[in-house]
């Protein structure tokens, strides 16, 4: 073969036998051997490879994305047990529960407002979803999963995360303060088959028990908006010995009596027209916001001559707030100071701030489904996202504001960065030695020497 040095024919024969090529492929094989032995490419430049670079091991460490750091906080063992318990992966045609959770959490952290936006965004990050344990999902599959998958799976995961956060705030039972309230969210008219509130208005309610010291919810119940607050409260678990603070939406003497029998301290409001039989008038400091401090009894009889179950000695404290309005604060605590009781009721605003933060930061204003199950899943996963942000924020403390931290997470969600370095500029890439360098076409004598060495190596 013209132009080939002695010894190349041996290589060609062995390569042809190894690859099983016919004889007419001899020309193409000769060109490939030239590239392998001589380093001559189609541009007729000599390709010289550094021996050390060819065997160099890539020591660059893999950097997970920010979303992965958030998902690490999830107790996946408990989650898998919940999936099996509720048979959540019963249908292979529906997206798996883990991929469903990851997609919905991406919508919460990333601010996606529709199923189509979730589908498109996940497709653009398909290569990164593998390390998360997720996958791309179509909007039809996600819609079906929201409508059919049991919401109890995600409710159980929410309870596990709540318990994990609560474990870091060990206190005496008497020091536990629990705030109870609800918030309403508006739904589209397509949810009218289960969430009709009035003519043309549909909505749902999220009933929450909130711990102001730990700054986290402890209990969640989602109902249609026409369900009364006290109806949901009667199904809430009661923690014996804790202090419960709530507003006039939970005005029920029977429920108050059940809290009193459990040893709980009650701090709430009395209606303006509620009679109060005074037994003792206590002194108050002049010039303070406390107008009066009295002990006595509630009415013995209710409507339709029903007996009042709240028959023990109780206390009424009249307070003037900043707006000049007078409040009648009710409590069954006869020993604490009037100012302490007033301050406890003032702490009720912490749950209102929590509702505002969740509505402004997470996605419960635009719902991805119209069924009751889909709404329950989205609200539950929104609170799961809140707890994951809390766990990550407590572990890093790169910023003091939870809102600023949530914005940083949203901006860098799919970036390969550490959560602790979100405020720092990304490091500059280190200059690397080129794997190849180009030299002019080597001389015929150099080719002959290299071919001879290659022939000896193959023969050996």
Feature map (PLM): residue ranges:
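Major-groove recognition helix of helix-turn-helix-like DNA-binding domains
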Residues: 132-148
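A cross-taxon signal for low-complexity, glycine/charged-rich
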Residues: 7, 13, 23-37
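A short, well-structured juxtamembrane/interface segment
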Residues: 162-169, 229-230
């Amino acid at each position: 073969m013209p132009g080939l040095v002695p010894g190349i024919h041996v290589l060609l024969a062995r390569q042809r036998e190894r690859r099983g090529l016919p004889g007419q492929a001899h020309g193409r094989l000769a060109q490939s051997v030239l590239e392998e032995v001589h380093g001559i490419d189609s541009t007729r430049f000599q390709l010289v490879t550094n021996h050390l670079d060819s065997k160099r091991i890539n020591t660059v460490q893999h950097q997970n994305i920010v979303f992965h750091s958030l998902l690490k906080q999830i107790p996946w063992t408990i989650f898998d047990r919940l999936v099996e318990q509720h048979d959540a992966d019963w249908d292979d045609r529906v997206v798996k529960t883990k991929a469903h959770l990851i997609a919905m959490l991406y919508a919460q952290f990333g601010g996606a407002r529709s199923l189509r936006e979730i589908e498109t965004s996940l497709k653009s990050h398909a290569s990164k979803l593998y390390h998360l344990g997720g996958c791309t999902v179509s909007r039809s599959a996600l819609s079906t999963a929201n409508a059919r998958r049991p919401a109890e799976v995600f409710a159980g995961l929410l309870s596990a995360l709540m318990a994990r956060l609560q474990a870091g705030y060990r206190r005496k039972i008497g020091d536990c303060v629990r705030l109870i309230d609800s918030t309403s969210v508006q739904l589209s008219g397509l949810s009218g088959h289960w969430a009709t509130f009035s003519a043309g208005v549909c909505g749902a309610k999220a009933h929450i028990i909130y711990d102001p010291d730990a700054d986290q919810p402890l209990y969640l119940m989602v109902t249609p908006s026409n369900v009364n607050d006290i109806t949901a409260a009667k199904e809430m678990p009661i923690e014996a010995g804790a202090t419960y603070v709530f507003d006039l939406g939970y005005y029920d003497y029977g429920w108050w009596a059940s809290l009193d029998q459990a040893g709980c301290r009650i701090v709430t409001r009395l209606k303006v027209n509620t009679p109060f039989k005074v037994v003792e008038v206590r002194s108050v400091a002049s010039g303070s916001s406390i107008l009066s401090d009295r002990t006595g009894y509630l009415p013995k009889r209710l409507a339709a001559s029903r007996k009042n179950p709240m028959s023990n000695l109780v206390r009424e404290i009249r307070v003037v707030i900043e707006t000049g309005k007078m409040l009648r604060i009710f409590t069954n605590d006869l020993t604490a100071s009037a100012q302490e009781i007033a301050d406890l009721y003032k702490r009720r605003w912490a749950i209102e701030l929590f509702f505002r933060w969740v509505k402004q930061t997470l996605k419960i204003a635009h719902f991805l489904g119209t069924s009751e199950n889909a709404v329950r899943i989205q609200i539950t996963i929104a609170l799961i996202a809140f707890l994951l942000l809390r766990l990550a924020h407590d572990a890093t403390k790169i910023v003091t504001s939870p809102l600023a931290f949530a914005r940083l997470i949203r901006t860098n969600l799919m970036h390969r960065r550490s959560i602790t370095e979100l405020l720092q500029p990304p490091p500059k890439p280190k200059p690397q030695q080129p794997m190849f360098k180009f030299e002019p076409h080597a001389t015929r004598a150099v080719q002959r020497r290299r071919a001879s060495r290659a022939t000896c190596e193959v023969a050996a």
